[in-house]
């Protein structure tokens, strides 16, 4: 029996109207005020901004949007962009802007704060947070010995109609980008075909988790922190579920890197570099750890929230985040009928 796909196409254009105004105005010439195009969680970034401004006196204006929308806007604006800094939840949008030649080199002192596996080899931007791919499952529907050993197993017939994901979102598309980088185009195309046959599309990670919690479907592919945040609060959306971590450098153990970079066109390079250094450094990473985002800090001197399994224990595959190809992922998912 084929799975009925929920309507999700409208989600791709949500931020367009609100972002359009950005291209119509220029940043202030004041060196003590910068503009950040922010696709990272707004609440976390506001905490960073408040602490940074208190420490440095530099004011920060946030323009909020999604990874893909803001990345495409920066490419369209080019050297005329009012943005000084770009922050994302996932790496593909950072790679998009990097490949357009729009990022300045990140200061070496900033890069040195972050281990090499959490930033691109090019040095054009840096990781600022990390999130792990997980399989959330309903404990009443899936026994431990039935859990998939690999993300690739979810394309097999035994998982038909039994799992879902937030297909249209940048989060899931980053996971597919990781699969593409690790296994290549043919394997990714085959897996997406199996997904089309087997899975239910949901608007996002939260909707996926809620559906799994209700038992329809049995499981879903999400990022870890949605589950941990709900567990730390009401547990209403996750009480009937548990997390399964893929191991052994499987594509399902992919760790997505949230990125930050300074625009080459910025006339406020010093202030922009200071902001990036702050959020990637100890002070900014402790704000992330001690807040309610439940994402992983990536600075070498900052441990994760103790509720989370250590990042080093996740057996994530090695993926250079600058190699994640958002355009190819979109093409492959469209070809498979997922977008």
Spans of features found by a protein language model:
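A bilobed periplasmic-binding-protein/Venus flytrap-type ligand-binding module shared by bacterial periplasmic
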Residues: 136-141, 180, 255-268, 287
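Extracytoplasmic ligand-binding site segments that recognize negatively charged/polar headgroups
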Residues: 39-46, 68-69, 75, 81-217, ...
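Extracytoplasmic "Venus flytrap"
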Residues: 30-49, 63
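Periplasmic-binding protein-like
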Residues: 131, 159-167, 192-195, 201-202, 237-264, 278-300
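Bacterial signal peptide processing site
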Residues: 25-27
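A ligand-binding cleft/hinge motif common to bilobed small-molecule-binding domains
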Residues: 92-96, 219-240
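C-terminal motif of bacterial Sec signal peptides marking the signal peptidase cleavage site
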Residues: 19-23
């Amino acid at each position: 029996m084929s799975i009925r796909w929920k309507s999700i196409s409208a989600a791709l254009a949500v931020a367009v109207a609100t972002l359009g105004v950005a291209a119509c105005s220029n940043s202030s010439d004041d060196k003590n005020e910068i503009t950040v195009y922010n696709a990272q969680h707004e609440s976390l970034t506001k905490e960073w901004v408040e602490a940074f401004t208190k420490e440095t006196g530099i004011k920060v204006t946030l323009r909020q949007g999604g990874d893909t929308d803001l990345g495409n806007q920066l490419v369209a604006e080019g050297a005329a962009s009012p943005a000084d800094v770009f922050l994302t939840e996932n790496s593909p949008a950072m790679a998009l802007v990097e490949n357009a030649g729009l990022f300045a080199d990140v200061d070496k002192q900033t890069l040195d704060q972050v281990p090499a596996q959490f930033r691109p080899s090019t040095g054009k931007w840096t990781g600022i947070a990390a999130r792990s791919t997980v399989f959330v499952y309903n404990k009443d529907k899936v026994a431990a010995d039935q859990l998939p050993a690999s993300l690739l197993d979810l394309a097999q017939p035994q998982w038909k109609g039994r799992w879902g994901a937030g297909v249209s979102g940048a989060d899931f598309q980053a996971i597919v980008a990781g699969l593409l980088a690790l296994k290549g185009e043919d394997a990714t195309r085959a897996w997406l075909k199996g997904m089309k046959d087997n899975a239910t599309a949901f608007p996002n990670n939260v909707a996926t988790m809620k559906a799994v919690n209700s038992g329809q479907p049995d499981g879903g592919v999400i990022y870890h922190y949605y589950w941990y945040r709900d567990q730390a609060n009401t547990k209403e959306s996750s009480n009937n579920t548990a997390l399964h971590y893929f191991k052994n450098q499987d594509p399902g153990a992919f760790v997505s890197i949230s990125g930050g970079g300074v625009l080459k066109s910025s006339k406020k390079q010093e202030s922009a570099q200071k902001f990036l250094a702050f959020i990637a450094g100890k002070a900014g990473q402790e704000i992330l750890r001690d807040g309610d985002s439940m994402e992983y800090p990536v600075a070498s001197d900052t441990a994760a929230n103790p509720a989370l399994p250590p990042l080093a224990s996740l057996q994530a595959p090695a993926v250079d985040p600058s190699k994640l190809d958002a355009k190819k992922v979109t093409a492959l998912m469209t070809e498979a009928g997922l977008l």
